[in-house]
Amino acid sequence: MTSTLVHNIGQLVTNDPAHDGTKLGVIDNAALLIEDGVVAWAGPDADAPTHHIKRRLDAKGRAVIPGFVDSHTHMMFAGDRSKEFRARMLGESYTAGGIAHTVEQTRGASDELLRSNAQSLLNEAYSSGTTTIEIKSGYGLTVNDERRSLEIAQTLTDETTFLGAHVVPVEYKKNPKDYVDLVTGPMLDAVLPFTKWIDVFCDKGAFSVDDARTILKAGMAKGLLPRLHANQLQEGQGVRLGVELDAASVDHVSHVSEKDIEALSTSNTVATLLPGTLFPYTTLFRSRKSVV
């Protein structure tokens, strides 16, 4: 067994109300014992264990907090969308059009490029305090490209999400139902060994609520856990579909109604807010405050 004692902590945030009666559970002048990578003890520095400690780290009065959890990332991609970002900053409309450009770049990228790009982003997240991270597919949109994206992602995190239903790719624009059949059939079967979650972009320019329900239920029938991109571009039924299916989360939720908020408040579904996507649209922050 390996044991590490972090001592001389100015403030330790435990998220255990038993310590100070608040949700943060702050302990002043604290210590933390880690055994085999797992927190084994937390408490006042004066009460810290002293036996069988193989490593001691002096926090020098700094704060120690739980690691950040990033539950929504799109790391499996190639290329960039700087032109789209510029357009959005100039106030031009966005209806998920930039996704198609990234799909083209991702399909043409090697496994090595996808892996190194994702690893670089992952390292950056870890260096900023993230300890648990989710990675989605969704920029391949073919059976092979979605499978290889998730196969690579699974080597980087335990939390992988199948997002074959990101948008309908250009080759299926005239027959979107055929793409839904592909996602719920051969594509789903191909990615099953490499994913835990299934996600759908249920919004304007992406998938209707009926198609989203069909796709999510197909994944759930195979043991995947549901989540959604919902109500990013306009109000719709995505949030309430997430509640209906007991989804782990509905993400973005930039446009929500009172009915959406009421549905969320009585459910187990978490609303994941992504404020970085709203920089060009500051007026939308008001609706986010209602969700909070």
Task: Tell what function each PLM region has.
Residues L5, K54-D58, T160:
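Conserved beta-strand scaffold positions in the cores of enzyme catalytic domains, especially
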Residues P44-I53, G242-E244, A263-L264:
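Short loop/helix-cap segments at secondary-structure boundaries that form the rim of catalytic
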Residues A59-N117:
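Metal-associated gating/positioning segment near the N- to mid-region
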Residues M1-P49:
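N-terminal metal-binding scaffold of metallo-dependent hydrolase/deaminase domains
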Residues I9, L32, G37, G61, ...:
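Divalent metal-coordination and catalytic microenvironments
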Residues L225, E235-V292:
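Active-site-adjacent C-terminal substructures of enzyme catalytic domains
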Residues Y126, V191, M220, V243-D246, ...:
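Non-catalytic positions within long, well-ordered alpha-helices that form the structural scaffold/packing
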Residues A100-Q119, N123, T131-Q237:
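Metal-coordinating catalytic core of metallo-dependent amide/deamination hydrolases
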